């Protein structure tokens, strides 16, 4: 991966109590895949503004808007890791959502960790959450869903799809990411 400018960071914003092991795993993959250092800072703690009481879920797009608005200037991207069940109006649930080519994305541990708390987490679930975190961050770097089933940018309908895909970008997506990072570093 091309060396990123040192002043650029990707901010990891945990919402609630999440395991240190999970956050460190996400930070390590951010460095490996995107070449950017990460920082950890909880910029949103209360997600009640996005709660839909009829669905008993949180509207992820509303959270993205707040994340982007509250991201510090030094963060070129911000990813929230939350434990709430997320949705967008056209789908019953989502594992995460991102602003395509934008600043913010979010991943929920809720369905990927089968409703367990963010502190009680196995390696299998850490791997799932990390894959989806990298997937959502990929969207912020203008990567679209990939038809290659093993690419980390492949769209997943269920947990088995997440388990099946690798933690790597396919050759095409890797080139697209490298081009985007060159553009950012100009």
Give, region by region, the residue ranges found by the protein language model.
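Short boundary motifs at domain starts and secondary-structure transition points
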Residues: 1-5
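A structure-centric signal for secondary-structure junctions around beta-strands
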Residues: 6-9, 75, 101, 167
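The catalytic-center signature of Zn2+-dependent metalloproteases
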Residues: 115-186
């Amino acid at each position: 991966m091309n060396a990123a400018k040192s002043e650029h960071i990707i901010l990891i914003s945990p919402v609630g109590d999440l395991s240190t092991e999970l956050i460190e795993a996400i930070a390590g993959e951010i460095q490996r895949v995107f070449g950017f250092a990460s920082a950890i800072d909880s910029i949103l703690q209360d997600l009640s503004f996005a709660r839909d009481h009829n669905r008993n879920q949180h509207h992820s797009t509303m959270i993205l808007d707040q994340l982007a608005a509250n991201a510090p200037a030094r963060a070129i991207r911000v990813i929230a890791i939350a434990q709430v069940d997320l949705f967008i109006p056209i789908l019953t649930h989502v594992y995460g959502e991102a602003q395509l080519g934008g600043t913010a994305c979010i991943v929920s541990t809720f369905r990927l960790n089968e409703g367990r708390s963010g502190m009680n987490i196995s390696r299998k679930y850490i791997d799932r959450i990390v894959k989806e975190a990298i997937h959502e961050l990929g969207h912020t770097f203008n990567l679209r869903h990939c038809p290659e089933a093993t690419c980390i940018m492949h769209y997943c309908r269920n947990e088995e799809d997440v388990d099946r895909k690798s933690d790597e970008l396919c050759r095409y997506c890797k080139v697209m990411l490298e081009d985007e990072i060159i553009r950012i570093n100009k």
